[in-house]
Amino acid sequence: EMCIRDRKVAIVGYTGAGKTTMVNLLMRFYELWSGQIKIDGVPVSEMRRSDVHAMFGMVLQDTWLFDGTYRENIAYGKPGVTDEQVEAACKLVGLDHYIKTLPKGYDTELNDRSSLSAGQRQLLTIARAMVENAPMIILDEATSSVDTRTEVLVQKAMDRLARGRTSFVIAHRLSTIRDADLILVMDKGDIVESGTHEQLLGKGGLYKELYTSQFENK
C-alpha cells in the first residue's frame, strides 16, 4: 500500500513491461482483478468512470488535434475558459510567441495536418492540460519523439504543469525522471522495484540496468 498525493511518480520498464496498463488501471479504462486504487479514500471501482477521467489531465506521445483554431484546440472540453487563461497557459509552455506570429494569432485554423513539429504538438497538449487544471496529471511517453533541445523545452513545461499536482510520468528517457519522488520499476506486469533514483541505482537491480543501458547506447 502506498500514498502518493502531490508527488511525482515515474513508471519505468522495458517495452511491454506493463507501464501503459498501469495508467489504464489508474484511469479505470481497465478493471482491477484484485486490490484497490483509491482517490481521496474512495475506491475508483465505486466511482463513475466519467468522474475518474475528469480528475486526470493527460499529455500523450501521440498528440491529437482537431479542425478548429489554436484557441479552440487549447480550450477543448473546458466550457467557460477565457482568452486570458488560454494565452497564460501558452506563455507558461513557450508557445505564445509562436502563435502570435501566425496570420490570425490564436484564431488561426489548426488541424491534424498542420505543419507543427512533434515538440510544438506536445507543448500545445501541455497548455491544454494546464487550462483543464485537473488535480492529477498523466504524462505518457511525453518526450520520446522529440530532439534533445526540444526535450528541454517540453520538460520545463511538464514540470510547470506537474507543480502542485499528483503526477504520473512514463518516459523512455530516464534522464527526465531522476527528480521523481517515487520511481516504480515494472517487469512482466509487476512492480519489481520502487524508490528514488539514488536508492534504485544503489540496489543495482533492473532500474540500474535500464539507466546504464541508455547511456551506453549514446
Model-inferred region functions:
Residues 4-218:
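ABC-type nucleotide-binding domain
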